[in-house]
Regions:
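Glycine-rich phosphate-binding loops of nucleotide-dependent enzymes
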Residues: 1-232
Length: 232
């Protein structure tokens, strides 16, 4: 039994690609394969022309690939600022530059007011943003964001959207965005890749994906599409 089959996903610099699909479609499995936490039984993974299929996560990170996780991966006893600094220093950034980088990212993600608080005391939405800041602290060429909007109040999602756009527009990084917030995905993605039952169901610009009845059927079921319950 294979979690993924015949999936061909390309992520380019300065581009946001949304990755969507029903629960169990294989989204997190794909992220784990791309970042080295799982190893494929066939196929290959390339990072800017280099075959990294057998590289461990740390080596991929040093090569410019960063990610966030669905669940917290922060140092709860350290301050918010220290969490970002540690991530930067771990990527080889000198301590003084790491502190400046942390200040920049905390401001970008609206966390400056929490800079000296222990990470373990953050609300869920703030903890998500800290995960994004830690990923960006390494100055990655590509960043994979796994459910960054989960737990965020709806009023704070536009701020997150602007932060993700800045990763693309100001830092020139490629972004793979996985989230159940479909409005966020549709708003900021340049392309969307749809998985269903471990296979690529569709790929294209947001307008094409929104109008794709196969995508609607994967989420709502064939009966809903046949009854005309789907709005394009």
């Amino acid at each position: 039994m294979h979690a993924l089959r015949e999936v061909n996903l390309e992520l380019r610099r300065a581009e946001i690609v949304g990755l969507i699909g029903p629960n169990g479609a294989g989204k997190t499995t794909l992220v784990n394969l791309l970042t080295g936490f799982d190893r494929p039984t066939s196929g290959s993974i390339e990072l800017e022309g280099k075959d990294v299929t057998r590289w461990k996560p740390n080596r991929r990170g040093r090569a410019g690939l960063a990610r966030t996780f669905q669940h917290s991966h922060t140092f709860r006893a350290l301050s918010v600022r220290e969490n970002v600094e540690v991530a930067a220093i771990g990527a080889g950034i000198p301590p003084r530059s790491a502190r400046a980088r942390a200040s920049e990212l905390l401001d970008l993600l609206g966390l400056t007011g929490h800079a000296d608080e222990a990470a373990g005391g953050l609300a869920q939405g703030d903890e998500r943003r800290l995960g994004v800041a830690r990923a960006l602290a390494t100055s990655p060429r590509f960043v994979l964001l796994d459910e960054p909007a989960a737990g965020l109040p709806e009023a704070e999602v536009p701020e997150l959207a602007e932060a993700v756009r800045s990763v693309r527009d100001e830092h020139g990084a490629g972004v793979l965005l996985i989230d159940h917030n479909m409005a966020l995905i549709m708003e900021i993605s340049d392309r969307i890749h749809v998985l269903d039952q471990g296979r690529t169901l569709a790929e294209g610009p947001p307008g094409d994906i929104r109008a794709n009845l196969d995508v609607a059927a994967a989420y709502l079921g064939e009966s809903a599409v046949q009854k005309g319950d789907v709005e394009a």
